UniProtKB/Swiss-Prot annotation:
Residues 15-193 form the Guanylate kinase-like domain. Its EC number is 2.7.4.8. Signal peptide: none annotated. It comes from Cupriavidus pinatubonensis (strain JMP 134 / LMG 1197). Essential for recycling GMP and indirectly, cGMP. HAMAP family: Guanylate_kinase. This is Guanylate kinase. The lineage of its organism: Bacteria, Pseudomonadati, Pseudomonadota, Betaproteobacteria, Burkholderiales. It catalyses: GMP + ATP = GDP + ADP.
Length: 216
């Protein structure tokens, strides 16, 4: 991840920024997709990347595909919230798009790793970080095996990485243990509901009402 420093933004937008963090195999993407299907007011942030599209991928759906030159130009203009170079390819989250969506009153959700979450917090101090945990290491290993995507040696590496990643759960605002999917999804929805009812969020969404009522 980039270590480029950013100045924290204290502006409170009508929309909220959610970050969902989890080790591989914890069920993060499945939970996020289910949440998005139920809540039309949440926008999923689509990352920018310089890697070539894979078969079946569409620009603007899985990723915003771009050239190295255009990526670097956007990065140098400060258009990215966070960025990283992975296996020779660049990946980034658009700061401009996120701010536009939040200013319009839409909530934005990022699927991100803990390092990226730290960078986002440097820029958006009000961002809500939600950490998804497996019910046990055994369950995590079973899920990785059942996915059928990785060789045994890759699964071992993912489990080792998971231990390091989960040690950062204490830095999050909320922790959800994904043992029973429906329960975990309801807890994720509850976090979204509670965040929307925070004083700062309500004031940003109902500015004129708060002024009329003399609430500061």
């Amino acid at each position: 991840m980039s270590d480029t420093p950013h100045t924290a933004i204290d502006t409170v937008y009508p929309g909220n920024l959610f970050m969902v963090v989890a080790p591989s195999g914890a069920g993060k993407s499945t939970l996020v997709n289910a949440l998005l299907a139920q809540d039309a007011a949440i926008r999923l942030s689509i990352s920018h990347t310089t890697r070539a599209p894979r078969p079946g991928e569409q620009d603007g759906r899985e990723y915003h595909f771009c050239t190295v030159d255009s990526f670097r130009a956007a990065r140098d203009r400060g258009e990215f919230l966070e960025w990283a170079e992975v296996h020779g390819n660049y990946y980034a989250t658009s700061r401009v798009w996120i701010e536009e969506q939040m200013a319009q009153g839409n909530d934005v959700l990022l699927e991100i790793d803990w390092q990226g979450a730290q960078q986002v917090h440097q820029r958006f101090s009000n961002a809500v970080e939600i950490f998804i945990l497996p019910p046990s290491l055994t369950a995590l290993e079973d899920r990785l095996k059942k996915r059928g995507q990785d060789e045994p040696n890759v699964i071992v590496r993912r489990l080792l990485a998971a231990g390091s990643e989960m040690s950062h759960a204490s830095e999050s605002d909320y922790v959800i243990i994904n043992e029973v999917f429906d329960n975990a999804l309801e807890e994720l929805r509850n976090v979204v509901r509670a965040t929307r009812l925070r004083f700062s969020s309500q004031k940003a969404r109902h500015t004129e009402l708060f002024i009329e009522l003399g609430i500061h």
